């Protein structure tokens, strides 16, 4: 989830021998309330440029790459439960959004699959980033024994229990 300009998807497709990678992103500016614009706010024109960049960057992979321009929740309806081997979450980073994505995509993964994401240790002001808190809470509620975090504190993952 959250393909932005397609860099991570390109890397995955280049070095991973999987059958198909689906990038999901609404490529749409999100609304915010309050007096301060969040530091991660991106205007719609930039989202449109990211979408075109993703299409161009991933075209070389043909049928192995598929983009869905929609929200995570709406796109998830296209996937059956226990049908995915891997899901990577790097969308909105506030607690509620991360928890929602975890709840949406966890059932879509097969037992033994990997649920992963980005920006574990990132915090740079409003809105409060809640990646770590959401992943820890979700893991506790779903009997996930081990959360693995890279040494740079950016990427996290866990295996779906059998």
Model-predicted regions and their roles:
Residues 1-162:
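S-adenosylmethionine/decaboxylated-SAM
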């Amino acid at each position: 989830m959250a393909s932005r300009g397609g860099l991570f998807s390109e890397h995955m497709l280049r070095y991973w021998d999987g059958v198909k990678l689906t990038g999901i992103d609404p490529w749409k500016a999100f609304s915010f309330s309050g007096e301060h614009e969040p530091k991660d706010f991106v205007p719609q024109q930039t989202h449109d440029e990211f979408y075109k960049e993703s299409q161009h960057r991933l075209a070389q992979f043909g049928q192995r790459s598929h983009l869905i321009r929609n929200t995570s929740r709406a796109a998830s309806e296209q996937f059956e439960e226990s049908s995915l081997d891997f899901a990577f979450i790097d969308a909105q980073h506030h607690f509620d959004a991360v928890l929602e994505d975890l709840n949406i995509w966890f059932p879509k993964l097969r037992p033994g699959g990997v649920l992963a994401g980005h920006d574990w240790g990132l915090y740079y002001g409003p809105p409060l980033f809640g990646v770590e808190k959401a992943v820890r809470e979700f893991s506790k509620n779903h009997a996930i024994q081990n959360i693995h975090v890279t040494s740079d504190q950016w990427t996290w993952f866990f295996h779906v229990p059998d």
